[in-house]
Amino acid sequence: MLQARDKTSELLSSLLFLILGFGFLSGCQSTDNTPEDRQTAEMAPIEVIKSPNDPRAYHFETLPNGLKLLVISDAAADKSAAALTVFRGSFHDPKERPGLAHFLEHMLFIGTEKYPEPDGYFSFIETHGGSSNAYTAPDHTNYFFDIQPEFFGEGLDRFGQFFIAPLMDPAYVEREKNAVHSEYQMQYKADGWRGFTVQKQAMNPDHPFSQFSIGSLETLDGDVYSDLMTFFEEHYSADQMSAVVLHKEPLETLVPWVKALFSDCLLYTSPSPRD
């Protein structure tokens, strides 16, 4: 579901890859001996080293639910933005359900318990000068949006609810299956994608890279909704997520309410290294 991106969203998507580095370094530098000590060290805020010419202020920490959070304060920003990566992608598709991770990316945007309107999120973002999108990669799925700063509070809350209490209404399964299939048909005609498919054919068939990943009406046939919910509960756990937020407010104001929101993301698994 990836289209042209706003520059702010491009920046945030890039910053999410830096979060991987923060998590890796914090783990490597820890010298604590017990699991409790290591968990305490990982949750302690990490000082972000930045250029002396960078006027922004940064805050990075791991929340109690395992989610890694980077908050950026930029008083000069003309837009506010946020992005969240789940470290689960097409490599995690069940062999019998190629394209399930991509299908979940589509279904996640269809309303939440707090904001149940199926298209309410996109309508709110677009009405207030913003944009939103997502993509599914082999090892992660990324969601992002930007919006006019004065509407960022509600925009971020609407965005965050997708990872807290999404509805994933089964009434929209067929609609989103067809949307996924349309992407497949569009890609199928592209020479670049065909070359990519040939590359997959040459791979070890036991490696997930060799598998079909977009999804189609055929691969998403049958009781796909049950498989969808199982995939969500097994993989969309807070300890498999990293989020980055950029807004005009100072960190003293921004950090507490951003932490409060993302602390509600559920921890389905015990904190563990990302598979």
Outline where the language-model segments fall.
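Conserved small/polar residues in nucleotide/adenosyl-binding loops
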Residues: 268-275
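Bacterial N-terminal signal peptides that target proteins for export
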Residues: 3-15
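C-terminal motif of bacterial Sec signal peptides marking the signal peptidase cleavage site
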Residues: 26-27
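M16/MPP (pitrilysin/insulinase) zinc-metallopeptidase core fold and M16-derived inactive scaffolds
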Residues: 43, 81-146, 189-193, 210-214
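Scaffold signal of the M16-like zinc-metallopeptidase fold and its non-catalytic homologs
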Residues: 36-42, 112, 155, 162-163, ...
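M16/insulysin-pitrilysin zinc metalloprotease superfamily fold
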Residues: 110-114, 146-177, 255
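Mature N-terminal segment immediately following signal peptide/propeptide cleavage
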Residues: 52-80
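Acidic/histidine-enriched alpha-helical segments
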Residues: 167-185, 250, 270
